[in-house]
């Protein structure tokens, strides 16, 4: 058994569902914080649990380079290595290799690239990417794909889409032959995390035996900014057969309006009974917008990356805490936010921490931004539970 997914309610194309995975029962739509190297930057695991994070991401490319897949595998996979007993998704490393355009060579077999750490040469293929992700042991893993740059010539996009389809078939073949090698010990048990409501802050532990449970491999739809190629990619990926489908290759520099157009048109071609994952987006307003279109899963580095640069999301709009006007501001960061940061600290103190380059500033900023994102998705789920005509979620911000 890999995953099960059910849709409990709809409002137009938006869906309210439950995704059951080996390590957690995930309420959807869901935002997934990104932990590139098995760490959500500046935020410890116990804080993530308090914030209600149901599922987080790890990055295969970075973990392959350091500490190495074998190190993680010997410790029971990422769950044991990072002491996280909720769900995890790993990407295939394809996007990161794509970003190393000056350091990589691509052919039918796979991609040869140089490490950004020490310049050493490495090779990723669909098979080796699956081998690495099986060793990392996430609940959901991703097929190996290629992401095209923006803008790109139509011939280049077609060639890349067709390569991704062939790699998807190879990814699934290897996965089906080796999925039993996941580092969960046969007969071992885990404190399975269950949440039955839209809150998801207080997940209840239940003991689950891992016998019979496997990872789930998602296929990825590519095709650049061409709706026809996206349709063809979706059809070919569905023909291969996966328990879930991702929309990749977006947020690579294209206008937001074009992103929405491609997401909306691609969703029309994806199965309604399978989870849909939009990779690498976006702002709080955007994740509400994409949930309203029928996306079930989203991830983005923005909340923590922006936090480290002093950009904070609030119900009153974005705040650049580095600005001098906050130096004497005794008010909370967001008067409508109930996170631990807004309950305790003033804008003046947060501005002081940033100006002083104190690490605590990065921690508190990151905790707030993640809380804002996760609370936004909780409100989206609550609005769908209430069968509203469209999801709402970002307090005080105009609907997209």
Can you describe what each PLM-predicted range is?
Residues 177-214, 388-400:
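Intrinsic disorder/low-complexity segments
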Residues 178, 216-218, 222-333:
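Glycine-rich phosphate/ribose-binding loops and adjacent secondary-structure elements
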Residues 149-154, 158, 244-251, 359-362:
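Glycine- and acidic
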Residues 154-166, 173-174, 229-240, 361, ...:
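Short, electropositive alpha-helical surface patch
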Residues 1-18, 26-30, 42, 145-151, ...:
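C-terminal extensions of enzymes
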Residues 24, 56, 91, 133, ...:
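Conserved, mostly hydrophobic/aromatic
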Residues 1-184, 324-327:
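Non-catalytic, usually N-terminal nucleic-acid engagement modules in DNA/RNA processing proteins
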Residues 69-72, 307-320, 374-377, 386:
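C-terminal helical cap(s) of enzyme catalytic domains, especially alpha/beta-barrels
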């Amino acid at each position: 058994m890999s995953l099960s997914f059910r849709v409990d309610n709809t409002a137009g194309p938006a869906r309210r569902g439950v995704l059951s995975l080996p390590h957690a029962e995930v309420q959807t739509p869901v935002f997934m914080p990104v932990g590139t190297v098995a760490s959500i930057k500046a935020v410890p695991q116990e804080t993530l649990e308090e914030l209600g994070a149901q599922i987080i991401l790890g990055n295969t490319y970075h973990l392959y380079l350091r500490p190495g897949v074998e190190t993680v595998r010997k410790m029971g996979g990422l769950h044991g290595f990072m002491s996280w007993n909720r769900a995890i998704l790993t990407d295939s490393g394809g996007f990161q290799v794509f970003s190393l355009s000056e350091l990589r060579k691509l052919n039918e077999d796979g991609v040869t690239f140089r490490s950004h750490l020490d310049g050493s040469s490495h090779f990723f293929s669909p098979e080796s990417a699956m081998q690495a992700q099986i060793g990392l042991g996430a609940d959901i893993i991703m097929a190996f794909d290629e992401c095209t740059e923006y803008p790109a010539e139509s011939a280049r996009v077609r060639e890349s889409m067709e390569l991704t389809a062939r790699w998807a078939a190879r990814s699934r073949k290897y996965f089906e032959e080796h999925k039993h090698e996941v580092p969960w010990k046969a007969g071992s048990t885990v404190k399975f995390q269950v949440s039955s409501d839209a809150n998801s802050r207080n997940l209840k532990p239940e003991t689950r035996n891992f016998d019979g449970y496997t990872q789930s491999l998602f296929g990825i739809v590519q095709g650049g900014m061409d709706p026809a190629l996206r349709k063809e990619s979706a059809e070919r990926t569905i023909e291969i057969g996966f328990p879930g489908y991702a929309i990749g290759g977006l947020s690579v520099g294209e206008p937001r309006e074009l992103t929405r157009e491609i997401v909306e048109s691609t969703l029309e071609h994806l199965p309604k009974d399978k989870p849909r994952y939009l990779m690498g987006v976006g702002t709080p307003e955007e994740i509400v917008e994409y949930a309203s279109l029928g996306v079930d899963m989203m991830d983005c580095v923005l909340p923590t990356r922006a936090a480290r640069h002093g950009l904070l999301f609030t119900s009153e709009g974005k705040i650049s805490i580095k600005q001098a006007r906050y130096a004497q501001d005794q008010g909370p960061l967001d008067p409508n936010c109930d996170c631990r940061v807004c309950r305790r600290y003033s804008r003046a103190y947060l501005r002081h921490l940033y100006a002083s380059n104190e690490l605590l500033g990065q921690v508190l900023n990151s905790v707030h931004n993640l809380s804002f994102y996760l609370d936004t998705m909780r409100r989206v789920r609550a609005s769908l539970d209430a069968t509203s005509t469209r999801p709402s979620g970002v307090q005080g911000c105009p609907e997209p």
